[in-house]
Regions:
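Nucleic-acid endonuclease domains
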Residues: 1-65, 69-141
Length: 141
């Protein structure tokens, strides 16, 4: 599987050069699409004309715009995840946050709809994993 090859290459790079390439975004977008039931071919077809800087959402599935956020600790001392990325806008319908382990293995995934997210987090400057864990659990290892 292509995802596994990408992860293997990134981990080898990290082993050799100390820092992994930034693949967490693309891996988490792919994993989220698979998690909500999108077929790999449909995801591939959707992404063909997209750019890495698309504003608002990462993909559309069953009429819903999905914004994806993720964290992956490097495994080095002090790399524990204590903050999570906050959505910069509300041009989406569903947000999924994924926490990976150091090997890009999904540990948990949580979903928020845009209105619940706004209500819960609009006034909070810095979000932690505990904030996102108040959403709907899509996966927990």
């Amino acid at each position: 599987m292509l995802r596994d090859k990408l992860v293997e290459t990134a981990l080898e790079w990290q082993k050799r050069f100390g820092v992994a390439p930034q693949i967490t975004s693309v891996v988490s977008e792919y994993d989220s699409a698979m998690l909500v039931g999108m077929l790999e071919k449909d995801y591939s077809d959707f992404m063909q004309d997209k750019t890495a800087v698309q504003k608002g959402f990462d993909f559309i599935f069953k009429g819903k715009r999905y914004q994806i956020k993720a964290n992956r600790p490097s495994g080095k001392k002090g790399s524990k995840v204590t903050w999570v990325p906050k959505a910069k806008n509300y041009n989406w319908d569903k947000l999924i946050w994924i926490l990976y382990d150091k090997n890009y293995v999904m540990q948990e995934a949580w979903e928020w709809d845009v209105e619940s997210y706004k209500t819960a987090f609009a006034e909070i400057k810095r979000l932690s994993p505990e904030h996102y864990r108040k959403g709907i659990c899509l996966y927990r290892k």
